Amino acid sequence: MMRQSLQAVLPEISGNKTSLLRKSVCSDILTLFNSPHSALPSLLVSGMPEWQVHNQSDKHLQSWYCRQLRSALLFHEPRIAALQVNFKEAYCHTLAISLEIMLYHDGEPLTFDLVWDNGGWCSAMLENVS
């Protein structure tokens, strides 16, 4: 009887730790994006001002930025086991990036979307990460 109650409690504790890990990683990524002296590619620090001087529809340019971002994030965030980076929107006044993240010790993928807005990166998802 004692063993059954212990098994019922363990997944909840594990899930809570996973949720905290996910929120921590997302918060740290957002902080990295908004750091003025970040080691991320300049597009990802300065966002729209730099993006507007490029051909936003150039798929090769988008692919290059995604590779640069992936490399920088994997270097700066050791809790990420695997990462895929995609542009959701890349237009003259809109820049949105989606990160598909697999964390160590977490079997479920985490999707984290970032949007350039009013001179900085933000994510409406940060409050909803679980």
From Swiss-Prot:
GO terms for molecular function: anti-sigma factor antagonist activity. Keywords: Cytoplasm, Stress response. It comes from the Bacteria. It holds the Pfam family GPW_gp25. The keyword Cytoplasm applies. InterPro entries: Anti-adapt_IraD, IraD/Gp25-like. Belongs to the GpW/Gp25 family. IraD subfamily. Interacts with RssB. HAMAP family: IraD (MF_02010). Inhibits RpoS proteolysis by regulating RssB activity, thereby increasing the stability of the sigma stress factor RpoS during oxidative stress. Its effect on RpoS stability is due to its interaction with RssB, which probably blocks the interaction of RssB with RpoS, and the consequent delivery of the RssB-RpoS complex to the ClpXP protein degradation pathway. This is Anti-adapter protein IraD. It comes from Escherichia coli O9:H4 (strain HS). The gene is iraD.
